[in-house]
Amino acid sequence: MEKSILLINGPNLNLLGTREPHIYGSTTLSDVEESSKGHAASLGASLQTFQSNHEGAIVDRIHAARGNTDAIIINPGAYTHTSVAIRDALLGVEIPFIELHVSNVHAREPFRHHSYFSDKASGIIVGLGVYGYKVAVEHVALNFKPLEKKAAL
């Protein structure tokens, strides 16, 4: 059975490629999503993508993943440092997740050093640029076990 992966990108990641390219690079989110889908398919997995600048929309998408998703890769953006709601949603659906950041958040402003997700993530990828998405997809596709499907919330 094909492994299903959900890739979630949080606030401002829709601006990848144009926002602070000296930090985030020039690759667009659309490019990242298409490349990630192709890489997942080459590894026998399916990948859905979702991006929102709104915390509640991200929570709703995580809830909708319950019962039909084996793993989540999430770049929570600025919500990394503020969102107990997204953390609780991830824990509530019991889907293993990888936390991902394009930049090295630990080499940036002190307020970016704290994450509400890191202590519960199956893995954390930080500072590899958009290549981190490929690493995350490959790790999930090759190492995560399919979950027993449950009823959606």
Curated annotation (Swiss-Prot):
The keyword DNA repair does not apply. GO terms for molecular function: 3-dehydroquinate dehydratase activity. Belongs to the type-II 3-dehydroquinase family. It catalyses: 3-dehydroquinate = 3-dehydroshikimate + H2O. Is involved in the catabolism of quinate. Allows the utilization of quinate as carbon source via the beta-ketoadipate pathway. The record marks 19 as: Transition state stabilizer. Substrate binds at residues 75, 81, 88, 102-103, 112. GO terms for biological process: 3,4-dihydroxybenzoate biosynthetic process; quinate catabolic process. HAMAP family: AroQ (MF_00169). Signal peptide: none annotated. PROSITE patterns: DEHYDROQUINASE_II. It comes from Emericella nidulans (strain FGSC A4 / ATCC 38163 / CBS 112.46 / NRRL 194 / M139) (Aspergillus nidulans). This is Catabolic 3-dehydroquinase. The active site is at residues 24, 101. The keyword Lyase applies. Pathway: Aromatic compound metabolism; 3,4-dihydroxybenzoate biosynthesis; 3,4-dihydroxybenzoate from 3-dehydroquinate: step 1/2.
